[in-house]
Amino acid sequence: MHIKVLEIDVSKTYPLRHALLRKGKALESCFFPNDTSEKTIHLGAFESEQLIGILSAYPKDCPDHNHLEGVQFRAIAVAPSHQRKGVASNLIQHAIKIVEEKLHPDFIWLNARIEANSLYQTNGFKSIGAPFEIESIGTHQRFLKPLNNDT
């Protein structure tokens, strides 16, 4: 399987966001604050010409580390037919490089669904704090990946 990761327009993320992360909810539930900010980065993983995975990165301080510059990863999703084949890790690794080059944050953080914890641990993220509930979505764990020695 040959995967190509490219920057994409936010509108291309909505079908996978809706189907995998907001199933049964209105399409508008997939529109996030700052989706269209010029500093927000949206990535797509493609096999041939088919979009099979997405990841969005937003310059945003982490509630636990608001004294440093952070970038939040959100809406990481992979088509069911391609899950557990390294697509999400590929997206995460590409996103880390692009974010470091373009935005120069001190760290990257995210709120992960509990069932995805091992994905983020495998990619160098450390859990912080206790698990918490996001209403109508489920139990999440916050993760952080330092990008410099001060974090």
Where are these regions (language model features)?
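Conserved beta-strand in the GNAT
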Residues: 44, 50-61, 72-77
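Conserved catalytic-core motifs of GNAT/GCN5-like acyltransferases
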Residues: 109-111, 121, 126-142
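Short amphipathic alpha-helix that is part of the acyltransferase structural core
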Residues: 1-32, 36-52
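A conserved beta-turn-beta hairpin within the catalytic core of GNAT-like acetyltransferases
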Residues: 60-73, 83, 102-106, 137
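Conserved acetyl-CoA-binding loop-helix of GNAT-fold acetyltransferases
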Residues: 78, 84-97
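Conserved GNAT acetyl-CoA-binding A-motif
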Residues: 92, 99-112
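Residue-level recognition of the GNAT/N-acetyltransferase active site
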Residues: 74, 79-80, 111-113
